[in-house]
Amino acid sequence: MKILVVTQYFYPEEFKINDLVKGLVDRGHEVVVLTCKPNYPKGKFYKGYKFWGVNEETLYGAKVIRVPVIPRGNGKSLRLVLNYFSFVFFSCLYVLCHRLRPDRIFCWDTSPILQAYAGMLVNKQTKAPLSMWVQDLWPESVSATGKIRQKGVMSILTTMVRGIYKRFDVLFIQSRNFRKSIEEKGHFKAEYVYAPNWAEDLYTEPNNIDLDKYRNLIPSGFVVMFAGNIGAAQDFGSIIKAAELTRDEKDIKWVIVGEGRKRAEAQALVEQKKLGNTVTFLGRYLSYDMPSFFVHADVMLVVLRDEYIFSLTIPAKTQTYMAFGKPIVSMLNGESNKVIEEAGCGFTANAGDFKALAANVIKAKNMPKEVLSRMGNNGRKYYDANFSKKRVIDLIAKKIENQQKP
């Protein structure tokens, strides 16, 4: 079966779509990926790529077509708008100029949802069944991260999103709560299929971890580790307030592994509060290095700001930490806390409740190591039963294969 995958992001950028494409190829399908020149997350093209021209290459056994795109730069609003719409323009232009005749069309919907337009255009030409894996809810996620808040713009985006959902036959959703938000925008013909995210193999099968590789970077003590993007959604103001409340617990160390547009602001706040002995920023490292950091953590931290949109989602790091067998401390609302509590793999606090977060960290620090270890094992068992990569890829692949042309 010929499957067209439309995604703005693809290898060497690190997203779940890479695994899914490989999984579809492994099942014997002929896969074509329509994407752009890689530039995420640093905002500039990876080595070997430039703006002009269309690149064609083979990755994971799939044919990969890369159209031009304006790189996202520093991630500010105007540059992101140019980045998003340039991919829409060049991907649709490619579709209009080339004959693509897939049997199925699959769109990967992390922000921006607008990338689906190229897939919709191929659907209009061929009537091939159309499916999409919804990773972010638009336009709510744009508003919640502070990128766009003007009511007029939000109204236009809502109309565009409504028009996109209307065209799809199947909507895979990474959180069950997504369905409610989508249906608030209208009644669509799409079938909803719950397809949660999985963790990368290096977390589920962490073989040959170099325990000493980064040991000298990790302060001694009870380590609360955050790993990932330091952005508006992560509410570092509240994280730092929680760290401040644990200042007198001298052996509690908050370790931040990651990068993002709010890092400088967060570091300035740490300096202002004189928390240099409590909070350590280590910067960004490649994903394959993460197990060498995680292994030194006592608990892993998951945080999202107090926004309705964030209460509907399960941040991917939840599955990652569960897969790695680490207990979790959270400060967020909704679905992710339900999962942590159901699995019995950590301590939950509501979004913005830095006092509860601090209390949970102190509680975890005072627990016997074997109790924390049991929590981590609970998380891994829950992950294997509900979120494993093979289970989710098989579910998505079978649904795509069984779609019927109208």
Feature locations, PLM:
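Nucleotide-activated donor-binding/catalytic signature segment of Leloir-type glycosyltransferases, i.e.
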Residues: 257, 264-292
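N-terminal subdomain of nucleotide-sugar transferases
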Residues: 1-57, 248, 405
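Acidic donor-binding loop of glycosyltransferase active sites
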Residues: 169, 294-311, 326
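Carbohydrate-associated surface elements
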Residues: 37, 177, 195-198
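A short, well-ordered alpha-helix in the C-terminal region of glycosyltransferases
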Residues: 363, 370-385
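Conserved donor-binding/catalytic core segment of Leloir-type glycosyltransferases
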Residues: 199, 217-234, 239-243, 255
